[in-house]
From Swiss-Prot:
DPCK domain boundaries: 3-194
Native organism taxonomy: Bacteria, Pseudomonadati, Pseudomonadota, Alphaproteobacteria, Hyphomicrobiales
EC code(s) of this entry: 2.7.1.24
Species of provenance: Rhizobium meliloti (strain 1021) (Ensifer meliloti)
Localization of this protein: Cytoplasm
Catalyzed reactions: 3'-dephospho-CoA + ATP = ADP + CoA + H(+)
Keyword Cytoplasm: yes
Cellular component terms per the entry's GO annotation: cytoplasm
Function: Catalyzes the phosphorylation of the 3'-hydroxyl group of dephosphocoenzyme A to form coenzyme A.
This protein's pathway: Cofactor biosynthesis; coenzyme A biosynthesis; CoA from (R)-pantothenate: step 5/5
Family in the record: Belongs to the CoaE family.
Gene assigned in the entry: coaE
Ranges in a coiled coil: none
Record's protein name: Dephospho-CoA kinase
């Protein structure tokens, strides 16, 4: 089974691209969705222990946690030491399940693919990109996004140019959904061809 990683800097259209892969029948494991699930399950106790007061009603209040991290960005590594191993375990379960089902390939949607050295466990890498102005416009429309928060996120991410240089496939979402869908269909066809 081919294990494909999907990544892209914030606002590049990675979630949209992942949805298009799903539409074509590709099993997709979304690391962000896994984190959301963990924030109402296994991660609650250890995150609350490290960041007292961020759990409300048995769920991690992501807005509160985000505020704490903007105020103390050096604590992000501490959060990642808690959450990343849990996300990785769920990813391994996903891969094992689809391998047992005989899937020819799966897609792992990993926002911090290069930053977490995930490429070592992947066979192919798809990078989603777009024009930098479009990226900024998309990101600044998000609820609760500030220029400070956007800058903090970008600072933590491998630059888009480096991601593209390390990719096996590039999906440029600067154009229409139809053009993006055509690029993704070509990748899926190539992967199915072996």
């Amino acid at each position: 089974m081919i294990i494909v990683g999907l990544t892209g800097s914030i606002g590049m259209g990675k979630s949209t691209a992942a949805g298009m892969f799903r539409e074509l029948g590709v099993p997709v494991n979304d690391a962000d969705e896994v984190v959301h699930m963990l924030y109402s399950g296994e991660a609650v106790a250890p995150v609350e222990a490290a960041f007292p007061g961020v759990a409300k009603g048995g769920v991690i209040d992501r807005a509160e946690l985000s505020l704490r991290l903007v105020a103390a960005p050096e604590r992000l590594a501490e959060l990642e030491r808690i959450v990343h191993p849990l996300v990785r375990a769920k990813e391994q379960e996903f891969v094992a399940r689809h391998r047992a089902d005989g899937a020819p390939f799966v897609l792992l949607d990993i926002p911090l693919l290069f930053e977490t050295k995930a490429e070592a466990r992947l066979d192919r890498i798809v990078v989603v990109t777009c024009d930098p102005e479009m990226q900024r416009e998309r990101v600044m429309k998000r609820p609760g996004m500030t220029a400070e928060k956007f800058a903090m996120i970008l600072k933590r991410q491998v630059p888009d140019s480096e991601k593209r240089a390390r990719a096996d496939y590039i999906v440029d979402t600067s154009d229409s959904f139809d053009v993006t869908r055509q690029q993704i269909r070509a990748i899926v066809d190539d992967l199915r061809a072996g």
